[in-house]
Amino acid sequence: MLSESSSFLKGVMLGSIFCALITMLGHIRIGHGSRMHHHEHHHLQAPNKEDILKISEDERMELSKSFRVYCILLVRPKDVSLWAAVKETWTNHCDKVDFFSSENVKVFESINMETNDMWLMMRKAYKYAFDKYRDQYNWFFLARPTTFAIIENLKYFLLKKDPSQPFYLGHTVKSGDLEYVSMEGGIVLSIESMKRLNSLLSIPEKCPEQGGMIWKISEDKQLAVCLKYAGVFAENAEDSEGKDIFNTKSVGLFIKEAMTNHPNQVVEGCCSDMAVTFNGLTPNQMHVMMYGVYRLRAFGHVFNDALVFLPPNGSDND
């Protein structure tokens, strides 16, 4: 969703500032992770507004209908309160969402992966999604239940990206020689990347179930290793100003950092106007974010989006 000004971010700020005030997230100053300026991976940016304005109205309508995002949520029974929150909030904006659980949960409908191992859950979820929906969706977004996502901003970022190309997007982190997309910020794969990954899942030499190492590594690193064998490399997603749009922390933490580092530019210094994800939220904060992003409006400010992504048919989204 594209706005004439930073009204979107201000809406988020007005809602999420209550999270920061209520939770009082400690007094420890936390940096913005391991974002470095000498990454070897590509930095992919969102399209400029001018490019969108050049598209005819008919083409915009066609684009809004053609972008279909399938959301994958990996959950465990202990996450039931977070599970409920994401089910009631942002996942309603996905074109399709499935919850993949480590075991059967009576309270919510889910697909039982029959394992507590997050890497095995991720593998099985990706295989299920590809086998069942490869002809229906061109982008696949995987997240934790602690993540809040603005799907319209994701679609806007992907607007000029070709899903027939091997995209593997999100917030990139470097670990030794391995560059990977952090699961904490959400992981986006194009249908081409899904095809390549699926072709490797049955080849233990290239994509082992246990990582092929003496010690266990995280599921997002193991995914990167498998994709690397398929010629798919991690790419950091940024807005047109170079700010990260997949965030591994909450808005509250970003605001605290901005108040310390940029006291005269808290809003501008916090995060991107076109942010796609924030992580580390409680169930209550999920609902506050939902209010700030989709409900709160400043009277007198005109929203003039050049492109509107239509909600899925029958969706109960906001």
Swiss-Prot record:
GO terms for biological process: protein O-linked glycosylation. The keyword Transmembrane helix applies. This is C1GALT1-specific chaperone 1. GO terms for cellular component: membrane. The gene is C1GALT1C1. Belongs to the glycosyltransferase 31 family. Beta3-Gal-T subfamily. Residues 1-6 are cytoplasmic. The lineage of its organism: Eukaryota, Metazoa, Chordata, Craniata, Vertebrata. It comes from the Eukaryota. It comes from Bos taurus (Bovine). Probable chaperone required for the generation of 1 O-glycan Gal-beta1-3GalNAc-alpha1-Ser/Thr (T antigen), which is a precursor for many extended O-glycans in glycoproteins. Probably acts as a specific molecular chaperone assisting the folding/stability of core 1 beta-3-galactosyltransferase (C1GALT1). Keywords: Chaperone, Membrane, Signal-anchor, Transmembrane, Transmembrane helix. The keyword Chaperone applies.
